[in-house]
Amino acid sequence: MGLVKMTRWRTLVLATAAFNLSFLIWFSFAPFTGQIAAEFGLSLTDLGILASAAIWSAPPGRILTGWLSDRFGASTVFGIVLAYVGIFSMASAFATSYEVFFVERVVVASAGITFVVGIQHVSQWFPEEELGTAEGIYAGIGNAGAAGGALILPRAFGNWSGPLFSTGWRAAFFYTGVVAILMAIVYVVFGQDAATKARAAATSESATLSTWVHTATRYGVVALALGYVMSFGLEISMNGWLPTYFREGFGSNLVIASTFAATFSLAAGLLRPIGGYVSDRLVRDQRDILPFFAGRYREQWTVLCMTFIVVSMTGLTFAGQTGNVLLTVAAGFLVGMSCAFTEGAIFAQVPAMFPNRSGAAAGIVGGIGTFGGIGFPLVYSFAAAEGMIHTGYVIVAALMIPILALNAFISRPHIASRAHVDGFFDGSRFESSQSDD
C-alpha cells in the first residue's frame, strides 16, 4: 500500500515518469557512439550490432514481466527492474574492456521491458473507453525519453571533465544509473497496483500458464504483435541508429547528429497519444474510415497507420539520396509520426481485448514487437557497409508489406469479431471466461 492515496491520474504520472527515465537509459549509449567506437576501436558494423544488442533482452523480458505484473503487481516489478538497471548502468561506467561493457549494456537495455509493466499498471486504473488515450499518453511521453537523452546527454556530458570520470559517456551512464535507483524507491513506496483490491486480485488469479498460452495464440494478438514489430520495433531501431546515420551520412558532429535524431524520437513519442485518442474517438462516434472493414473502428485506424509507415520509410530513402539533410530530417519526422500513430492504435486495442490479462497481452505484443529493433539495425549497418547508407530504409519497408497484409486480413469484420477468441488451437474452453473479461 502506498503512502498517499493514488488516483488514476497520479498513477499515470508515476508510470509515465518512470518509463520516460527507462527509455532515456535504454538508449543512453546512442549519443555517444562516436566516443565509444573511438575508445574500443569499433567499426560501423560493430555499432550496428551494439544498437541491435540493446534490444536482445526485450522480447523475453517483456513477455515475462507482463505476466509477472499481472501476478505480483506492477509496483513491485517496476521497482525491481529499475533498481538492477541502475546498478548495471553505474557498473558499465567503469568498464575497461569492450566485452565487459557489452554484457553490462545488454543488461542495462532491459530497461525497455518496463513498457509492459506500465501498460499493465495504467490499464488497472482506467476504464475501457479511456484506455487508448491513457495508454497513448503513458507510452508517448515515456518514449520521448529517447529524445530527451539525445538532446540532454551530449550537452550535459559531451565535454565532461568533472569528478570521477574524464569521459562523458562514462559520467552519463553512472549518473543516470543513480537516478534509476532513486526512481525505483519512489515507485515501490508510492505505487498501488490497481484501482481496487478486487481488481488486483482478479488480475492476479487469472495469471496462469494456460491463460497465457491462450492469449498468446489468438489471431488478434499475433497480428498486432507483428504490427508492433513494424512500428515500435522500427522506432527503437531508429533511436539507436539515427545518430550514427546523420554523422556518417551527412558528416554531422555529435551534438548536431543527436539533435537531428531527436526530431524522430520526439515525433515517435509525443504524437503517440494521438494514435490512441483517434482510436477511442472512432469507437465512440462509430465512424468508418475504411468501409471495407465496416464496424471494426479500431482495426481500420491501425491498418491505415501501418500503411503510413511503409510509405514514409520509402520516402526516407529517397530524401536521404538527395543529400539534403533538412529534407531527410523532415522525412524522419514523418516516419516517427507514423510509428507513433500505429503504436497508439495498437495499444488502444490490446488492453481492450483482455482487460483481466492486460499484462500478459501487452507483454506478448510488446515483446515480439521489439524483434524489429534487433533485426532492422543490422539491415541499416550492412547496407551502410556496402556504401548504401540510405537504402536500408526502403529494404525494411519492403519487409513490412506481408505484416501489413496479415493485419488487413485479420481486420475483416467476420474475422476481427472473434480475433480475441479464435487462434492457433481450440480456444472454446476459454471463451466463457473471456466473455467475462
From Swiss-Prot:
It comes from the Archaea. The keyword Membrane applies. It is a multi-pass membrane protein. Keywords: Cell membrane, Membrane, Nitrate assimilation, Transmembrane, Transmembrane helix, Transport. Induction: Repressed by the presence of ammonium as nitrogen source. The chain crosses the membrane at residues 12-32, 36-56, 76-96, 106-126, 134-154, 171-191, 221-241, 250-270, 300-320, 327-347, 359-379, 391-411. The keyword Chaperone does not apply. One of its GO terms (cellular component) is plasma membrane. Signal peptide: none annotated. Belongs to the major facilitator superfamily. Nitrate/nitrite porter (TC 2.A.1.8) family. This is Probable nitrate transporter. It comes from Haloferax mediterranei (strain ATCC 33500 / DSM 1411 / JCM 8866 / NBRC 14739 / NCIMB 2177 / R-4) (Halobacterium mediterranei). The gene is nasB.
